[in-house]
Design a protein with these regions (language model features):
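Short, well-structured N-terminal submotif of metal-dependent ribonuclease cores
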Residues: 1-70
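Acidic, PIN/NYN-like endoribonuclease modules and their adjacent C-terminal/linker elements
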Residues: 3, 121-122, 133-169
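Alpha-helix capping/helix-boundary segments
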Residues: 10, 43, 82, 131-132, ...
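General small-molecule cofactor/ligand-binding pocket signal
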Residues: 38, 76, 166
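Active-site neighborhoods of divalent-metal-dependent phosphate/nucleic-acid chemistry enzymes
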Residues: 49, 74-146
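Short, hinge-like loop/turn segments at secondary-structure boundaries
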Residues: 55-58, 93, 161-164
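Short, mixed-charge aromatic SLiMs
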Residues: 70-74, 159
Length: 169
């Protein structure tokens, strides 16, 4: 598969015609429009969550954003093939950025001890960003984001298929 995968920050601005950077993302995407542009189910969930908790956004604007979301047809779900790139990214992030006192602690054999409780704050990466990046790697898509995602990009260079990022501003 080829094309682009929109990160939450890109999709939310694309679907909000009143956002000050809406025109910028539209122009950016028009310049790459010969390739398919995909969206992750995680991005849809993050935006819907945001709409539900932001009380200052008027109902009409929320409806406009939801209508734009509904028009987007190229949606990627998580599946068993997302597991490998996700776990590879998360493991590399853990090895590189977890606090030293956490790195040697997973030596027991009880299943409940194998669950990693290292937080996004400790790794410097949001959990959903790892999932979205994993989908981009899984499908060989270029991730369109406003974030640098420097830690994810850095550790992905050790993987068979590193993350490709197209940053827009």
């Amino acid at each position: 598969m080829d094309g682009y995968l929109l990160d939450t920050n890109a999709a939310s601005i694309l679907w909000d015609a009143r956002h000050r950077d809406h025109r910028k993302i539209k122009i950016f995407l028009e310049n790459i429009s010969s390739s398919p542009i995909w969206i992750s189910i995680i991005v849809l969930a993050e935006i819907e969550y945001g709409l539900k908790i932001v009380p200052r956004l008027d109902v009409g604007r929320q409806d406009d954003i939801r209508n734009e979301m509904a028009k987007f047809l190229l949606i990627l779900a998580l599946d068993k093939h997302t597991v490998a790139p996700y776990s590879d990214l998360r493991a590399e992030l853990f090895k590189k950025y977890a606090p030293k006192d956490r790195k040697g602690r997973l030596t027991t054999r009880r299943p409940e001890d194998l669950v990693d409780r290292t937080t996004a704050k400790e790794l410097g990466v949001q959990e959903n960003d790892i999932w979205i990046a994993a989908q981009a790697i899984q499908y060989n898509l270029i991730l369109v984001t406003r974030d640098r995602m420097s830690r994810i990009a850095e550790v992905s260079t050790t993987l068979t298929y590193p993350l490709q990022i197209a940053a827009w501003k």
